[in-house]
Amino acid sequence: MSKRDYYEVLGVERGASEADLKKAYRRLAMKYHPDRNPGDKESEDKFKEANEAYEVLSDASKRAAFDQYGHAGVDPSMGGGGAGFGGANFSDIFGDVFSDFFGGGRGGGRGGAARGSDLRYTLELNLEEAVRGTTVSIRVPTLVNCQPCDGSGAKKGSTPSTCPTCGGIGQVRMQQGFFSVQQTCPRCHGQGKIITDPCGSCHGEGRVEEYKTLSVKVPAGVDTGDRIRLSGEGEAGTHGGPTGDLYVVINVREHEIFQRDGKHLYCEVPISYTDAALGGELEVPTLDGRVKLKIPEGTQTGKQFRLRGKGVAPVRGGGAGDLLCRVAVETPVNLSRRQRELLEELRDSLEGDSSHSPKANGWFDGVKRFFGDL
């Protein structure tokens, strides 16, 4: 199978500068690197092809030979006098490539201290606690520094030894094709030290499990999903690393009367048939106690009344929301004979007078028009 032109492989003009070659190769190396395309044979082949093209074109003598004789000028198998692979300097490019792959450059750095993990604790509150604020005590499972070994993991009186695999660096160099990469040492897991005489309390881990009791001050106005950060109350770091944080996540339980939407509260208020028709006054609950609500005559189911300032004051500031009361008119049940007679008299007196039921009459008129059009 014939090889593609090296300039075509890199996607550059034949007169491309060294900087253009480097930029083009770096782009292809990032795109087709095996670590980004595991198990993809096509990407692996393109990665090797780009390596070969850059190895030739980045070397002035090889590039001149390729420009004059093509592949025959650089490939010994085709009768040319090329020197083969190994002459190109990939280190400056691969430093940038691996910085993007692994979040750092080629430098290893000594392993050891690592920050402890953050913890998450879900705190259940009722609506009143969330609205008014409260202080609660919580018990959280965590990892703390082992006291007998002071977090070192080694038995008291002993010291960890230098890892023979990585020489105390915490990383090992792995060869991949034309270049090498640094990876975490599989023996010491990046610590650079091997514990030969582990602490009996933590078994060499340097940390032990423990329950921690904390007092959490919950500000007024919190809602489900809000988080309270307790700095330094997460898991202990390893080998002297900083402690993580604890995030207390609020979950407000459902209330039997109120529903919350942001800073507003909602509730349903049942009223009698007669109060809806004649009007009246009734007491409705709020988080601050009962208040009187005036019901005008002719109130229908679904009518909503707003009690300003009876909602929730947001935790981030601003005025309190409102309480919105939705009326639900109850149809009377279990009527006595006399009550039925009175309602029948009322029905008879209202029959034929559309002014008492404008919505119902409008609906029936619409039904008549609908069937009349069929």
Swiss-Prot record:
Binding site for Zn(2+) 2: 163, 166, 185, 188
GO molecular function, one term: heat shock protein binding
Presence of the UniProt keyword RNA-binding in the record: no
CXXCXGXG motif repeat intervals: 146-153, 163-170, 185-192, 199-206
Cofactor binding notes: Binds 2 Zn(2+) ions per monomer.
Main location: cytoplasm
One CC-aspect GO term: cytoplasm
One Pfam family per UniProt: DnaJ_CXXCXGXG
Function, in words: Participates actively in the response to hyperosmotic and heat shock by preventing the aggregation of stress-denatured proteins and by disaggregating proteins, also in an autonomous, DnaK-independent fashion. Unfolded proteins bind initially to DnaJ; upon interaction with the DnaJ-bound protein, DnaK hydrolyzes its bound ATP, resulting in the formation of a stable complex. GrpE releases ADP from DnaK; ATP binding to DnaK triggers the release of the substrate protein, thus completing the reaction cycle.
Family: Belongs to the DnaJ family.
Protein name: Chaperone protein DnaJ
The organism of origin for this protein: Pseudomonas putida (strain W619)
